[in-house]
Each structure stands twice: as structure tokens, then as C-alpha cells.
Amino acid sequence: MLVSREGHCLNDLLYRWRIGALSGDIAGIVSNHPDFGPLATAYGVPYHHLPVSAESRPQQEAALLDLVDRYDFGLVVLARYMQVLSARLCAQLPGRIISIHHSFLPSFKGARLYQQAYDRGVKLIGATAHYVTADLDEGPIMSRRPPGWTTR
């Protein structure tokens, strides 16, 4: 899984994995920030900090590909990973990267989706899981879900 600073999606996926509600294995967590090392350790999942900047992006993505190969990541999940992946990286992992996006795509693409929804007067947003392509938030949609709120 790839994650940046916001940990709610990562926490939810790790919890679901721990209780058996998420099939498969979590082979590792990669982040461009150092924040989630202790959380990964608590779940017994390898953690890799790969900082990224505009200048270091090619080296960071090469290191990411090395981890994908070394740990045999079958699928790369972007769990609030707030970096745009290069076309080159997307081409090297076709159909193997999915993103969890906090809106009903194709509406409200990119990082400022809550502001976009607010500006348009939208009262309810949900989440979309989609395959990642070189075009931001344009990949084939796997699933859309409304918020899982309850009144309990």
C-alpha cells in the first residue's frame, strides 16, 4: 500500500485485514513521509519510507518498482497517496495499481475534492475504487460506495 500523511484509509484497511474482512496479504507499506512506521510495526507489516520531490521522482519510483518486485506485490493500493504517479510507472504496472478516491468519480478529481464538492453544493459524497492510469483519476472504475454512516 502507498500512503502519504492522511492515515484514515490506511488504518481502515489494516484493521479490516487484521479481523479477516480483507482477503489477501499486505506485503508492505510505502510512504513518502516517515509517519506510519510505528503503525506498520504494530501490524507486523514491513514499512518503507521513500521521500519524493520533483527532482527525485524517477529515483523514488525506481525504488518503488524494486520493492514491488522484491516483495512480489501483486497489487499496489493507493490509500490516500497524494502523489501523481508518472506515466512510466503506470505503464510498468498496468492493471496492478488501484486507488481509493474519496468522491464518486468522474466528479471531483484530484486532491481538493472536498472543496470542489462544497463549491458545487453537493451534500453527499462517497468513494470510488479505480484502476490507476497515466491520466489522473480517469482509470476504469471498479466500485463506488456511499458513506457507511449509521445512526447507531
Give the ranges of each region predicted by the language model.
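One-carbon transfer enzymes
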Residues: 1-152
